[in-house]
From Swiss-Prot:
PROSITE patterns: DUSP (PS51283), UBIQUITIN_2 (PS50053), USP_2 (PS00973), USP_3 (PS50235). GO terms for cellular component: cilium; cytoplasm; nucleus. Deubiquitinase that recognizes and hydrolyzes the peptide bond at the C-terminal Gly of ubiquitin. Involved in the processing of polyubiquitin precursors as well as that of ubiquitinated proteins. Plays a role in the regulation of NF-kappa-B activation by TNF receptor superfamily via its interactions with RELA and TRAF2. May also play a regulatory role at postsynaptic sites. Plays an important role in cell cycle progression by deubiquitinating Aurora B/AURKB and thereby extending its stability. It comes from Mus musculus (Mouse). Keywords: Acetylation, Cell projection, Cytoplasm, Hydrolase, Nucleus, Phosphoprotein, Protease, Repeat, Thiol protease, Ubl conjugation pathway. The modification N6-acetyllysine is found at K973. Residues 609-639, 896-940 are annotated as: Disordered. Residues 946-1026 form the Ubiquitin-like domain. It comes from the Eukaryota. This is Ubiquitin carboxyl-terminal hydrolase 48. Residues 616-627, 924-940 have a biased composition (Polar residues).
Amino acid sequence: MAPRLQLEKAAWRWAETVRPEEVSQEHIETAYRIWLEPCIRGVCRRNCRGNPNCLVGIGEHIWLGEIDENSFHSIDDPNCERRKKNSFVGLTNLGATCYVNTFLQVWFLNLELRQALYLCPSTCSDYTKGDGIHGGKDYEPQTICEHLQYLFALLQNSNRRYIDPSGFVKALGLDTGQQQDAQEFSKLFMSLLEDTLSKQKNPDVRNVVQQQFCGEYAYVTVCNQCGRESKLVSKFYELELNIQGHKQLTDCISEFLKEERLEGDNRYFCENCQSKQNATRKIRLLSLPCTLNLQLMRFVFDRQTGHKKKLNAYIGFSESLDMEPYVEHKGGSFVYELSAVLIHRGVSAYSGHYIAHVKDPQSGEWYKFNDEDIEKMEGKKLQLGIEEDLEPSKSQTRKPKCGKGTHCSRNAYMLVYRLQAQEKNHTMVQVPAFLQELVDRDNSKFEEWCVEMAEMRKQSVDKGKAKHEEVKELYQRLPAGAEPYEFVSLEWLQKWLDESTPTKPIDNNACLCSHDKLHPDKISIMKRISEYAANIFYSRYGGGPRLTVKALCKDCVVERCRVLRLKNQLNEDYKAVNNLLKSTMKGDGFWVGKSSLRSWRQLALEQLDEQDGEAEQSNGKINGSTFNKDESKEEKKEEEEELNFNEDILCPHGELSISENERRLVSQEAWSKLQQYFPKAPEFPSYRECCSQCKILEREGEENEALHKMIANEQKTSLPNLFQDKNRPCLSNWPEDTDALYIVSHFFLDEWRKFVRKPARSAPVSSIGNAALLCPHGGLMFTFPSLTKEDSKLCQPLERREGGWPTAAHNNIALIWPSEWQMIQKLFVVDKVIKITRIEVGDVNPSQTQYISEPSLCPDCREGLLCQQQRDLREYTQATIYVHKVVDNKKVMKDSAPELNVSSSETEEDKEEAKPDGEKDPDFNQSNGSTKRQKTSQQGYVAYQKQVIRRSTRHRKVRGEKALLVSANQTLKELKIQIMHAFSVAPFDQNLSIDGKILNDDCATLGTLGVIPESVILLKADEPIADYAAMDDVMQVCMPEEGFKGTGLLGH
């Protein structure tokens, strides 16, 4: 099919030869493209918008073939949420609770612990016996033991693929959005559980934590002098093994039990010798628990950075661990089998993900527990190889080779071993009846949900099949051919064929013209379909209005024909007018604006389009929608403000403008052609005189300009020094022969000088408004010390407050000589006279001077103004401050911030060989200054820092300085984050100071720290001394670690 523009031209080509009154039905059907050939499927690739008979590519392709039933719904198979046979149940990750989930799975697969918890008395039994379970109430565990009971029962017999542990997490008071130290959680929870179970009467329940996890070791100290041995016996629930510098688990255990020498200042006080003696100390394992927890200390405190870091070194461990060599008492079996490996994915101590590899004690098969997902390992061997490749480490340490029965990991942080004798002696743990009843109820809810989801899927499939049959039937009957037809919106047809959206009633209102018929311009978004198909659509979906053959609008077609013919005539007239303008004009002509002549064709086209639009709006509707008359008036008003044809030569009085450069004469013939398109345009024959009022105003303007020049010259001659800003008085160097000075507003001076420089462009200044310098009581608002400057034009209306910060930013007064004041009173009207008189006090020291003002100072108003300005400096938003980064400039930091100590490891040679500022830091590559200038900047910056106090309204940036937008209520920590983005310096590497004061309270606001707009803050960055893998977690690093403070683990 031809392109859309070609179809548009073809539909209206007949209008070139047919007059509006001769338009027939055939012309109307041609304009509406009734008889265009329909497109064929497979030939036409996409829908032809210019052809109402093209029904290809409207979304039918998805319905005309075989359709998979699953495409009729968006509901997942509920059986995907069902627990797989012979598998375990997962736990939902509530945000950052993966570390909790891993320990819950490890403890669940400890059958002895599970059995003991099932034996605990519970309020659940009362709930099942009463009306709780039958009354439809949800069971809410009351204690930690009850939460574990219910969780373990669900993990054992639930039909769900995963369960929600939010009740257990909420009972502990854990923050689900904050990742915590998994090893600390394990210790605290075991302590809490032991304390809770210690109150039980059943010894199997009361002592289960000690029996399963508790061992004993002794700190043994031997005096080298007398050989006396002292023991301190302690219980342990896990062994914390240092992995730094080791490659095998056995090496870590050996170091844990290694003998330590106590010598020198660390000597041991021997009670037998009654003095300090050299001694040895070591740990002896006295007894080992059934379940041996080995904590690998992967997360350690880094003294250099002041934060935790993760050790990503590989540690080798075996599936079988013989602890007999490490135990003092050799009786019994001490061979352990590996039962769980807890993994931390990630290179940082502040982020990552926790998973667990746990062995089923009954089948001996290994499973990977990853929150909701449970994966069974192939065979009966532990597989960590894939796990170790998930997180690439920055260190390129190669993974060591592992022998049979051994494994290596750089992410394992806890190993759980079970005593081999107990590992093989397992019986099935039964869920108590009262807990099983709760599990059955939860399973019943799950089954009901599965049935409900399956029914919803079935309903969606049935609806989809019915829609499929409807589309296959109706699409074949859509083409109208020579049969009776109707028009339907293309958008509605596409939505009817779109399975993802419900079909709404047909709405053709957007396609109507002002005559409530089908608009010819809207044919591109309509489709012509058979009357048979239209009847079915309207009977099933409703809507309207129905657009039959009677909806073809003859009035719109006739009007469009008229406009098209006028446009064709306009092209011919445009060429004729251009030719007439080039030829020599004979006889009288007409004045036409040059701007109108350049754009008359465009104006005529716009006028024709406006007429076409007004025809559409004639019945109060636009495209079927009600037309707002108020909006129409506003649009017309805006259009009227634009100049119409030949209005560019009208003067303000509606007559011919006196500016001859903006118009030209055209011939009578050219004007006649132009007047056909603009009959209401202003007409000015060549003999018409220009506007008489404008001529008078022009003469008066010339006279006023001459008068202004004369006044300006007179005032300049009378006040030459004031105009040129020379020989100005100042209070600090008061002339001996002058007793009084006067004050005027600096605003008056600016306006007066502007007039004197350009009297033709500015109005004369006739008065001086000094009242603006006074308070409402008529008193002065500034003190005399603030006027004692090097130059009176730099005077500020307020003095500095204590601390050196200026309290005013604008200079608004000037001092006047008495002789100048006499002349000013003659030339201008002065509303308020402000006079300062000097009086010398004392006969011995005449240099002591007092100043008396008329009017006098108003202390109350001045104090109020000072307080207001102080408040404004402390309460600002989106103000600009400047941060200056100091690099290799130790002297500057010492001078401006003595509290900052430079690293003591720097030698004198390093100081001498320090490169210029710009050679090491990219933030300094902002200036092309010479090396000589860089060398002098060290001394100059101290002076610059002092000059910051005398800040002007315009700050001049220097090298290594960046502007930041801040607010007074913003904390220092938030400012450090901004500085980090601007300078790529981590907050913990930033040393900030302002006027020699160190900024170190991260929680304080900038307002309380004395940071005001236009302040300059010095930034000294610490040199990087380690690989900051935790740079991505800098926001979390900067926050103080609170651990499990405020949770149930610490008895909140």
